[in-house]
């Protein structure tokens, strides 16, 4: 839905920009204002009160969305031998080592998450400049550098997603599809906010959650009250 289209303008008129909506209200309105031509993705955009340029104010982590994202993630695993077999058995879409690295260097990035066994990280470091900016670099803090590749693959396939603040102190998380029931969207939202609050750096002073907007890929932004994370009865 183009922002210049009549349908988008009509959808935007349904949003009261002077109001801060509850998570459930925002989820319901996101569904109502989304294009009916496709099952749009529902995303949360958060402006954080941190300075990402400082190492002690980096915000990153993982969240297991109780209802998933509505999309089965494609997972790449850097592993060899038994670990490679375990990853494949768990449902990994791409498994390899030097061969996988060469494919990525050649431009192949057809996956949503990457996992590596610890012994592969020295090799994976060669493509850090490719994976890092895309949020695909395996990291022990997010559970994607691990010997238990089967569990890591299962977690990601089951709805576990990573989040990381960008250079402008913004953070984006997908919480589902417009076809989801609004309560499921709100519950995914609550789970995501819980983890983001848990990841608050001790060095962050003042207001941590500065601004929150929920939107679909085809609809207008809906401002959400940062003080309300799990009051699902408000709708």
Swiss-Prot record:
Alphabetical list of Gene3D superfamilies matching this protein: 3.30.190.20, 3.40.50.790
Keyword list, A-Z: Repressor, Ribonucleoprotein, Ribosomal protein, RNA-binding, rRNA-binding, Translation regulation, tRNA-binding
CDD domains: Ribosomal_L1
GO annotation, cellular component aspect: large ribosomal subunit
Coiled-coil annotated residue ranges, if any: none
One Pfam match: Ribosomal_L1
GO function term, MF aspect, one: rRNA binding
Protein task: Binds directly to 23S rRNA. The L1 stalk is quite mobile in the ribosome, and is involved in E site tRNA release.
Family per similarity comment: Belongs to the universal ribosomal protein uL1 family.
Quaternary structure (record): Part of the 50S ribosomal subunit.
HAMAP family: Ribosomal_uL1_B
Protein name in UniProt: Large ribosomal subunit protein uL1
